[in-house]
């Protein structure tokens, strides 16, 4: 299976309120420190493997403004891929809900392939990429 990244679309993700990045056969990402380069790599890994660019599990990806998380909207990473010549859109979205007294919260992840809701198991199985192999 040949997989090529065509685009990443980010919503409320780390330092990005909304941003789209197009990828080509060769794409260079360059910027000053702290401007979001690692966030782009984390968006890819978080969507597919629930880890950051350093392969640490379950990273905090919700955008913050003034040191406070933006909770009133979902956080998402959408990958537009070319899989064996066919365009495939894979999306992971995270919704935050608070307890009634506001003392705790829960982040629920939802997964989509070509806008069709999927279970985590089906989402992970779609590309057949093993995270342990990816880490090598």
Predicted segment positions?
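Short strand-coil-strand connectors
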Residues: 11-17, 82-86, 114
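Polar low-complexity intrinsically disordered regions enriched in Ser/Thr and small residues
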Residues: 37, 69-70, 131
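Short solvent-exposed loop/turn micro-motifs enriched in small/polar/acidic residues
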Residues: 13, 71-74, 103-104
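Extended, charged alpha-helical "arm/stalk" segments used for dimerization and assembly
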Residues: 27, 87-136
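Pre-Walker A-like glycine/lysine-rich segment at the N-terminus of P-loop NTPase domains
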Residues: 1-45
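Conserved P-loop NTP-binding catalytic core
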Residues: 30-31, 41-99, 109
């Amino acid at each position: 299976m040949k997989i090529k990244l065509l685009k990443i679309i980010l919503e409320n993700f780390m330092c990005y309120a909304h941003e789209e990045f197009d990828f080509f056969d060769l794409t260079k990402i360059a910027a000053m420190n702290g401007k979001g380069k690692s966030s782009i790599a984390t968006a890819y890994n978080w969507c597919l493997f629930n880890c950051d660019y350093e392969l640490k599990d379950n990273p905090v990806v919700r955008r913050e403004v003034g040191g406070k998380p933006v909770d009133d909207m979902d956080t998402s990473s959408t990958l537009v891929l070319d899989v064996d010549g066919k365009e495939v859109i894979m999306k992971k979205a995270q919704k935050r809900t608070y307890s009634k007294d506001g003392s705790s919260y829960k982040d629920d992840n939802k997964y989509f392939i070509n806008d069709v809701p999927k279970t985590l198991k089906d989402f992970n199985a779609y590309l057949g990429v093993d995270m342990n192999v990816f880490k090598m």
